Structures are given as structure tokens and as C-alpha cells.
Amino acid sequence: MCTAVLGLPSCAQKKTTVPAKAETKTATAVKSETYTVKTLPAGVTADSLQAIEKEYKGSVALIDVWATWCPPCRRAMTMVDSIKPDLMKKGVKFVYITGETSPLETWNEMIPKIHGDHYRLTKEQWKTLMNEQGIPGIPVYKVINKDGSTAFSNLTEGGYPGNDVIKPILEAAVKKK
């Protein structure tokens, strides 16, 4: 089910409850010229978003929660592509999070064209992320400042707010001390 929010619709997620167990571990990464595949250890379920955010402390990052099968997610990525090169030159990191609902083969085919860091969460990590953050559907976005604080979040609303909203937020975050 898709709903219209902030111009672009989002794809609804099923609400599930997964017991949370806090654990602190670091991500591992495989890097290429234009993208990096990162993973969280399978044991990390609770606070998976916070674990990912820690990897970007000291940088401004746009976090995009999406899926390969989600047309609004793919349309939003196309929109972001027009502002991404300029923002990357300014040091903005682009972080893409999906789960096992995105078929591995499809995801592997898509990510080389999506410049940034990519996480493919386990089924349990994905369900916990959706529940902990109150994410009703995808895509959803979060901008984090260099100090790790939140500059923008629509995790509980969904939909891409548009480049006219996201770009100024990212630029302001880059300038922030």
C-alpha cells in the first residue's frame, strides 16, 4: 500500500514486534570506486540506526531507508542524483539502508549506480529498525549533523520531501561548526 506524503508517496511496511537487545558493534565494509557495502554484525538488532549513525560522526550524512521493490524510493533517488555531486564535494555522505525484502541479486545490480554507502540489514534488524523508529513506510530520510545530532527526520511520516527541502538542510549542516 502506498500513501502520498510530502509530494512523493511511500510504501507502507507491516508492523511487527521484535524483542530488542542492545549491543554495540562496528560495521564492516567492502569498498568500490563509487559505493561501499557495509554490514552490521548479525547480533546487532536494537539501536541499529544508532550503530549506523556512529559510523558517520564527524560528517554530515543523508540516511535513506528504502527497498529495491519500492517505486517511490527509486524515484526519490533519481531526484537526489541531481544534487548529490555538489553535496558530495562538500563532504556529505549518502547512506542507504535496506533489508532482506530487497532481493540480494536485484540489490547487487542496483547499488553500483547509487553512489554512497549501502547497508542491507537482516530480516530481524529491518523489523527492529521499523518498530524502534516508528517507520510507517518507505522511503524515509534522516540528516545527521557532524556532531551526530539530527538536522532533519521524517522517519515517522515517510516520503521524499524534495530537493528544495533536503538540499538547504544539508548545506546548513555542512556549514555548522
Q: Model-derived features: where do they sit?
A:
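N-terminal targeting signals for export/organelle localization
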Residues: 1-42, 176-177
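A short beta-strand-turn-helix
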Residues: 40-61
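Conserved segment of the thioredoxin-like fold in thiol-based oxidoreductases
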Residues: 36, 85-126, 135
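Thiol/disulfide oxidoreductase modules built on the thioredoxin-like
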Residues: 124-169
